[in-house]
Amino acid sequence: MLKHDTIAAIATPPGEGSIAVVRLSGPQAIVIADRIFSGSVASFASHTIHLGQVIFEETLIDQALLLLMRSPRSFTGEDVVEFQCHGGFFACSQILDALIALGARPALPGEFSQRAFLNGKIDLVQAEAIQNLIVAENIDAFRIAQTHFQGNFSKKIQEIHTLIIEALAFLEVLADFPEEEQPDLLVPQEKIQNALHIVEDFISSFDEGQRLAQGTSLILAGKPNVGKSSLLNALLQKNRAIVTHIPGTTRDILEEQWLLQGKRIRLLDTAGQRTTDNDIEKEGIERALSAMEEADGILWVIDATQPLEDLPKILFTKPSFLLWNKADLTPPPFLDTSLPQFAISAKTGEGLTQVKQALIQWMQKQEAGKTSKVFLVSSRHHMILQEVARCLKEAQQNLYLQPPEIIALELREALHSIGMLSGKEVTESILGEIFSKFCIGK
């Protein structure tokens, strides 16, 4: 990537829409825009919007709004011009072609964000958060990405960096004055411990952050032929699972994504629980039991028209809901239990609204206050912080056993890893790998 050239790209998704945005950034952005816009772009003040015509080679392309943001007060830190034209394919494509013909280069994926990073407008954590905002598949993932983009994670990383620097400075003073027989190491010990506490807090949040980003897992379980697959289809409002009256039809775990009021749920349909001599069905039942243990919650489906068998003990070890299916045929004999129970019909939809409301309330209660804290969701961040924790633990354990110079080496290694996180120590190849995942125009 050449930092001194000017790049251009369409910043909105392709297809029909009310408007499309073409973005231009670089030292020649204003000069190039001035050559195709009817107004005098060079004379426009920064952060102003102007209505005019886009004309190239004496041909009118479109009437558009032009937004000008002069360096350094722009997202990339460079001169930025955006054309807001009519949506669809042709207007924005012709504007982009004109900009390229006049000297702009087609932007690479994520290149606008990469320039923002290289110009110090955002750090690498914030740059990665931009991509996570775009690809978020539920409201929790979006909010977590938002906390990262707002700099909350970066502030904690800076706090860790400062604590390590302060501990390192103290140790370097001791190394310069070795005549001190019994140096007081309480100060670096406290700094290292505080830094390690923050790092370990983030590491421990990784699994929960992943769960929030990926969605809550709910498993549909129960005896064979109670209507689990019919219920899956009813909740998804589409025929996803095969429904028959033959017990044991479902053998593999069937997973579907279900978006419920912005909450992403991984809905799993499993084999019915029964004793069988069929080896393939046995394997499906074993997988279902394993999935029940790993799931966040269980929807245990019961046939209200059949005699009730004992409930499995696992229902009382994690959030579980009893769904009495076929309630359109007979009133269900509710149990005297603490588990929430619902009379439903996968066939008519009876009771499904109440089930959805209960699931939403349960998830909101489970996640109350969680998305306001900073979670670790990136595997890259997780791996780096594990290395930081290792270095800090080594320094902590050897603080009274090794010379200050040896402890300082561990702390410098921790600082290097912190730099990999923020982007201060990152290599060109890693940057390329990160930003290549972005869409063009971002």
UniProtKB/Swiss-Prot annotation:
Keywords: Cytoplasm, GTP-binding, Hydrolase, Magnesium, Metal-binding, Nucleotide-binding, Potassium, tRNA processing. Exhibits a very high intrinsic GTPase hydrolysis rate. Involved in the addition of a carboxymethylaminomethyl (cmnm) group at the wobble position (U34) of certain tRNAs, forming tRNA-cmnm(5)s(2)U34. InterPro entries: G_TrmE, GTP-bd, GTP-bd_TrmE_N, GTPase_MnmE, MnmE_dom2, MnmE_helical, P-loop_NTPase, Small_GTP-bd. Transmembrane segments: none annotated. Its main location: cytoplasm. Residues 215-364 form the TrmE-type G domain. It is found in: Cytoplasm. GTP binds at residues 225-230, 244-250, 269-272, 325-328. One of its GO terms (cellular component) is cytosol. The keyword Magnesium applies. It comes from Chlamydia pneumoniae (Chlamydophila pneumoniae). Belongs to the TRAFAC class TrmE-Era-EngA-EngB-Septin-like GTPase superfamily. TrmE GTPase family. K(+) binds at residues 225, 244, 246, 249. The keyword S-adenosyl-L-methionine does not apply. One of its GO terms (molecular function) is GTPase activity. GO terms for biological process: tRNA methylation; tRNA wobble uridine modification. Mg(2+) binds at residues 229, 250. Homodimer. Heterotetramer of two MnmE and two MnmG subunits. (6S)-5-formyl-5,6,7,8-tetrahydrofolate binds at residues 23, 82, 121, 442. Binds 1 potassium ion per subunit. Its EC number is 3.6.-.-. Its cofactor is K(+). This is tRNA modification GTPase MnmE. The lineage of its organism: Bacteria, Pseudomonadati, Chlamydiota, Chlamydiia, Chlamydiales. PANTHER family: TRNA MODIFICATION GTPASE GTPBP3 (PTHR42714), TRNA MODIFICATION GTPASE GTPBP3, MITOCHONDRIAL (PTHR42714:SF2). It comes from the Bacteria.
